[in-house]
Amino acid sequence: MASLRSVLKSQSLRHTVRSYSSQTMPPASPFAPRHFLSIADLSPSEFATLVRNASSHKRAIKSGSMPQNLQGSLLGKTVAMIFSKRSTRTRVSTEGAVVQMGGHPMFLGKDDIQLGVNESLYDTSVVISSMVSCIVARVGKHAEVADLAKHSSVPVINALCDSFHPLQAVADFQTIYEAFTPKAHHLSSLGLEGLKIAWVGDANNVLFDMAIAATKMGVDIAVATPKGYEIPPHMLELIKSAGEGVSKPGKLLQTNIPEEAVKDADILVTDTWVSMGQEEEKAQRLKEFDGFQITAELAKRGGAKEGWKFMHCLPRHPEEVSDEVFYSNRSLVFPEAENRLWAAISALEGFVVNKGKIE
């Protein structure tokens, strides 16, 4: 089975940061807490548990009953939020989750801290982790969050990097779990087997973790991108490896024709065509993604299921999806956004409160 570390390392996703005074790389933290960098880090049962817990906590808290195991569970604990990229939903959901659990969120934006610029990632990780109970990092390169985790003495949770977005995947599958009646299932499943997701747009970090999760949960996913924007080979390897040990893993289809992806789909999904850092490519991308807008007409032409739903992690731009779909009763966009809060609570519970024991 290809590990997350081996797949990423083999594809040269590492990057250069400020050099160390010694030629020898400092050792990993001897305390070895468990980190959450991608859905690939989880077993199928652990992922399903995070999703179920998020949904359960949502029902309880919204009914006015804070689960006993969450009451004051982060009391006296500080969660450092290292955000080198701007954020709306991730920041609000993370800060809200920490506060609801009784902890203190400490926001460190790009004007407060620049990873690997004035201080090595090793020094930053060792120092900050000695003062807090968890690091939630929203960064550029995956290597940045991976290096933070390698040398941290506390759990590191990836709040987005260029390769993965695990908290979004938990929220997305919570949304699907709540919108579709689950079948009878074991603890390693969500009972969503047989569903099909159609992703139409850019193959990006949100898709990668969604596809890994879909494979683990027995949910098929069809991805339609323009030529040249397909899932890269190393990610295909990682997605495929996610199905090892799963009795009926979800199947992945890649195509350059949106209608092919949409056929028999239960959920249509898209995301921004121009991610942060790709602004100079905007004009070219808009030209090449022409024809990939999700519309009711596309769903009809492609033969989506009669009761199909729509999802988008936001922020949304009109070229990606029509207003008719985005604001329709098919849209799960706003419950999906709210579920970022419950996903954050579930992740903090699993990796900080329960020290990586997810049950």
Swiss-Prot record:
Residues the record lists as binding carbamoyl phosphate: S87, T88, R89, T90, R138, H165, Q168, C313, L314, R340
Gene Ontology CC terms, in alphabetical order: mitochondrial matrix; mitochondrion
The keyword Zinc-finger belongs to this UniProt entry's keyword annotation: no
Enzyme class, first EC level, given as a word: transferase
UniProt keyword Iron-sulfur present: no
Chief place where the protein resides: mitochondrion
EC identifiers of the protein: 2.1.3.3
InterPro entries (alphabetical): Asp/Orn_carbamoyltranf_P-bd, Asp/Orn_carbamoylTrfase, Asp/Orn_carbamoylTrfase_sf, Asp_carbamoyltransf_Asp/Orn-bd, Orn/put_carbamltrans
Catalytic residues in the record: C313
Transit peptide, residue positions per record: 1-24
Keywords for the protein's UniProt record, in alphabetical order: Amino-acid biosynthesis, Arginine biosynthesis, Mitochondrion, Transferase, Transit peptide
Source taxon at top rank: Eukaryota
Binding-site residues for L-ornithine, renumbered to this chain: N205, D271, S275, M276
SUPFAM superfamilies: Aspartate/ornithine carbamoyltransferase
One GO BP: citrulline biosynthetic process
Location(s), subcellular: Mitochondrion matrix
Family, per entry: Belongs to the aspartate/ornithine carbamoyltransferase superfamily. OTCase family.
Subunit structure: Homotrimer.
UniProt-listed NCBIfam families: orni_carb_tr, PRK00779.1
Protein name listed in UniProt: Ornithine carbamoyltransferase, mitochondrial
